[in-house]
Amino acid sequence: PVNNKNQIIPMYTYPCYEWLDSIDWTDSKVFEFGTGYSTIWWQNKKADYYGVEDNGEWYHKIKEKSKIKYETDLKKYMKTIYDYDFKFDVIVIDGQVRFDCIKPALKKIKDNGMIIYDNSDWHKSSKEELDKTDLIPIHFHGFKTMHVDSTTTSCYIGRKFNKKANHIIPMGGTIREQHSTDKSIL
């Protein structure tokens, strides 16, 4: 999947993608449980990217360009994040054993970080587990590329999250003049 500039985009819901795409992620440490098109997108955003993948075919396609580990033992898969002696700015849960990846993610996320949980509407127990934390949930409902039904990508942000989104022009949208009601008349 690509955007209107022919750049690969992650398979998050469009509202989530647009918000994430408006933020500068340069040098942010990102870990992803389950890699995919988002791997390429995060790297294009100049993030310091790490991940774990259990699909050998995909792993061999992208291993040269990234710090991804290949792991098919799912107990080891969910613990791969502990191989790093630092915490992450962003942790994406979008692969196998999602529920079991929550605890490791919570231990390895920075106070000002964010956990992205894709398809949270498909995983009620996982969503409820994340909702119990002190993280602030933002649920982006909508369509996503290559899907015919809507879904939810949830971002759980730390209370010290300090990344600022730039002005968002929706995909297919146009830049317009400032609307007359967007100014004070007083």
PLM regions and their residue ranges:
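A short acidic, Gly/Pro-enriched loop at the edge of an enzyme's catalytic core
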Residues: 81-90
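Class I SAM-dependent transferase core
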Residues: 1-9
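Short catalytic-loop micro-motif centered on adjacent basic/acidic residues
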Residues: 29-32, 51, 90-93, 115-117
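C-terminal substrate-binding/active-site "lid" region of AdoMet-derived donor-dependent transferases
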Residues: 96-186
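Short, well-ordered alpha-helix to beta-strand connector turns
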Residues: 27, 46, 66, 88, ...
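A polyampholytic, Gly/Pro-enriched intrinsically disordered region
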Residues: 68-79, 92, 137-144
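SAM cofactor-binding core of SAM-dependent methyltransferases
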Residues: 10-76
